């Protein structure tokens, strides 16, 4: 077994290798003067079970091309099996046609990864579960809920916790955490007037005097979370913390979060944190290395990964 990584999330790749007690594979990813991407694998992979760790996060297209070219390089080097490990799967929000004459980009990206030569895909908290079906190769979609629940138990009195979904679409995910913590569930009902903006309307559930935990898969602009936090506090919540798997945090999101009423934003390292994220006083990053490392180990040894979903 060998593990390689592109440039998108080398810190996580190194942490995964530390968990597996393996060195990170030698690979060079560089650009020519015209910005074409060039990949060179620096060690023998013939007959090896190869795992390539690459989040297709910002800059999404560059990191996606790095992944595809790296898969091709490993395939042409006679690897026995190639697993694309995608802690964050970019384009996942384009999982359906929002109108006429529009693409389903998530399906296109799945096709590209398959055609490049990947034999398996391992990912984390896909934005929509049906994206698993976009791949024509075995795909394991791990859940971050166990990691988030463990952190909540270490930092909160569960008797005073209320799990909150920031919108109706995230109720299933929030319910899974609430069930694991044996806590009550509330929902923030919001209306989005235009793309990139969200207006909180009302809170469904009694949050007065509760430590509210907003749960979602992606935080992008941060507008939804900040508005939800304000609404919850107006309804009597003692504090509001957000637990989000993927910290996209584009544009002015970090500044928006740091100046908001959120007590804390807890994200995973599925996307490598920027300097701004690392220096923010109310943003904390927790590791997925053990979860992904264990899944990689079991996959390589042909063992079941189903217990990792519990």
UniProtKB/Swiss-Prot annotation:
One GO BP: purine nucleotide biosynthetic process
EC number: 2.7.6.1
InterPro entries documented for this protein: PRib_PP_synth_CS, Pribosyltran_N, PRibTrfase_dom, PRTase-like, Rib-P_diPkinase, Rib-P_diPkinase_bac
Catalytic residues as annotated in Swiss-Prot or TrEMBL: 190
Reaction catalyzed: D-ribose 5-phosphate + ATP = 5-phospho-alpha-D-ribose 1-diphosphate + AMP + H(+)
Location(s), subcellular: Cytoplasm
Binding-site positions, Mg(2+) 2: 167
Record: residues binding Mg(2+) 1: 127
Keyword annotations: ATP-binding, Cytoplasm, Kinase, Magnesium, Metal-binding, Nucleotide biosynthesis, Nucleotide-binding, Transferase
Binding site for ATP: 34-36, 93-94
Cofactor: record remark: Binds 2 Mg(2+) ions per subunit.
Xref: Gene3D superfamilies: 3.40.50.2020
Pfam families: Pribosyltran, Pribosyltran_N
Cofactors demanded by this protein: Mg(2+)
Pathway(s) served: Metabolic intermediate biosynthesis; 5-phospho-alpha-D-ribose 1-diphosphate biosynthesis; 5-phospho-alpha-D-ribose 1-diphosphate from D-ribose 5-phosphate (route I): step 1/1
Assembly with partners or alone: Homohexamer.
NCBIfam families per the UniProt record, alphabetical: PRK01259.1, ribP_PPkin
Recorded family membership: Belongs to the ribose-phosphate pyrophosphokinase family. Class I subfamily.
Matching HAMAP family: RibP_PPkinase_B
Protein name: Ribose-phosphate pyrophosphokinase
């Amino acid at each position: 077994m060998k593990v390689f990584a592109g440039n998108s999330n080398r810190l996580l790749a190194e942490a995964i290798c530390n968990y597996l007690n393996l060195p990170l594979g030698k690979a060079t990813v560089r650009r020519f003067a015209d910005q074409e991407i060039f990949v060179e694998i620096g060690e023998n992979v013939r007959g090896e079970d190869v795992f390539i760790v690459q989040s297709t996060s910002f800059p999404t297209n560059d990191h996606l091309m790095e992944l595809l070219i790296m898969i091709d390089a490993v395939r042409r080097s006679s690897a026995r099996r190639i697993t694309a490990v995608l802690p964050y799967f970019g384009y996942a929000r384009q999982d359906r046609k929002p109108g006429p004459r529009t693409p389903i980009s998530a399906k296109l990206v799945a096709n590209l990864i398959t055609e490049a030569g990947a034999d398996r895909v391992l990912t984390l908290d896909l934005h929509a579960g049906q994206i698993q079906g976009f791949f024509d190769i075995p795909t394991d979609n791990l859940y971050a809920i166990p990691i988030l629940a463990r952190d909540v138990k270490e930092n909160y009195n569960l008797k005073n916790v209320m799990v909150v979904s920031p919108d109706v679409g995230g109720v299933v995910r929030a319910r899974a955490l609430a069930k694991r913590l044996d806590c009550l569930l509330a929902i923030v009902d919001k209306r989005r007037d235009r793309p990139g903006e969200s207006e909180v309307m009302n809170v469904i559930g009694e949050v007065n005097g509760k430590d509210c935990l907003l749960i979602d898969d992606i935080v992008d602009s941060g507008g939804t979370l900040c508005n939800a936090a304000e609404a919850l506090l107006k309804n009597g919540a003692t504090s509001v913390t957000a637990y989000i798997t993927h910290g996209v945090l584009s544009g002015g999101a970090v500044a928006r979060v740091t100046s908001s009423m959120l007590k804390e934003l807890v994200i995973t390292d599925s996307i490598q944190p920027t300097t701004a994220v690392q220096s923010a006083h109310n943003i904390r990053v927790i590791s997925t290395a053990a979860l992904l490392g264990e899944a990689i180990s079991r996959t390589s040894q042909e063992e079941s990964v189903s217990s990792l979903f519990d």
